[in-house]
Amino acid sequence: MSKIPSVNIKELLDAGVHFGHKTSRWNPKMASYIYGERDDVHIIDLRQSVALMSVALNAIYETVKKDGKILFVSTKIQASDIIAEYAEKCGQYYVNHRWLGGMLTNWKTIAGSIEKLNKLDKTLENEEALMGYTKKEILDMSRKKDKLLLSLAGIRNLNSKPDLLVVIDTNKEHIAINEAVKLNVPIVAVVDTNSNPDNVDYPIPGNDDSIRSIRLYCSLFADAALQGLEESMKASGVDMGAMQEHTDKALTSKNVSKLKQAKKFSKTKNIDEETNTEFEQALNDADENKNSDNA
């Protein structure tokens, strides 16, 4: 059986996943995922992040294992290239520049735009056909193609609604989330301290701005999808060979000073004692590192 990827507290801490937003910008609905605060910045409870990431990765794995389609969505600058890279790595779909209203709920219109893109592609690749156009007309077609590619490159082969939506930054991608909710498409999403987790089926508390954090999430998502694909292919009698293992990250630990501890909440039941100890120790180690650096 394929091994679903996992992550530990140290990996999350090293990637800066625990850093939320300023306390003044928080969404009270995220209270249950917040461990405390430091210098007016909320600190995310990584014990819950570990547990909920595991649940989300299993959802991704099971979706692909059952031949489902996953749509990755994040149009923010720091996530755009990373989302495309890892979605392509695991053979899934993505939107990484601009979410066009109706991408899910008005698929007929989007399909028409994809058809237009494919026709432009076909024309521009046909040297004989291009002889019938002026240079200006060819330039106009190239510009139209490039504009369409920005929005549609990652979904041009998506023939129906996805079976799972994976989102980084629920605030920025609220239109995509609303459309998924209308169509009953389950949602995996990284939820920062200023996010609303209400419509998210598989929330992952974490920093949604740090490039290192985003790369870690996407690497895990892609690995889970690849493991699901491996199982799907095995069930079909196809030997895919060795799958690429999760790449170890050589990340530098972030320093965390003494925390002003908030009231403890937990939406993830039965966080084991080992995880509690690991989290407390990781924070203490980071604290000691900072103190020694300042000595």
UniProtKB/Swiss-Prot annotation:
<dbReference type="InterPro" id="IPR023591">
    <property type="entry name" value="Ribosomal_uS2_flav_dom_sf"/>
</dbReference>
<feature type="region of interest" description="Disordered">
    <location>
        <begin position="263"/>
        <end position="295"/>
    </location>
</feature>
<keyword id="KW-0689">Ribosomal protein</keyword>
<dbReference type="GO" id="GO:0022627">
    <property type="term" value="C:cytosolic small ribosomal subunit"/>
</dbReference>
<protein>
    <recommendedName>
        <fullName>Small ribosomal subunit protein uS2</fullName>
    </recommendedName>
</protein>
<dbReference type="InterPro" id="IPR001865">
    <property type="entry name" value="Ribosomal_uS2"/>
</dbReference>
<dbReference type="GO" id="GO:0003735">
    <property type="term" value="F:structural constituent of ribosome"/>
</dbReference>
<dbReference type="Pfam" id="PF00318">
    <property type="entry name" value="Ribosomal_S2"/>
</dbReference>
<dbReference type="GO" id="GO:0006412">
    <property type="term" value="P:translation"/>
</dbReference>
<comment type="similarity">
    <text>Belongs to the universal ribosomal protein uS2 family.</text>
</comment>
<dbReference type="InterPro" id="IPR018130">
    <property type="entry name" value="Ribosomal_uS2_CS"/>
</dbReference>
<dbReference type="InterPro" id="IPR005706">
    <property type="entry name" value="Ribosomal_uS2_bac/mit/plastid"/>
</dbReference>
<keyword id="KW-0687">Ribonucleoprotein</keyword>
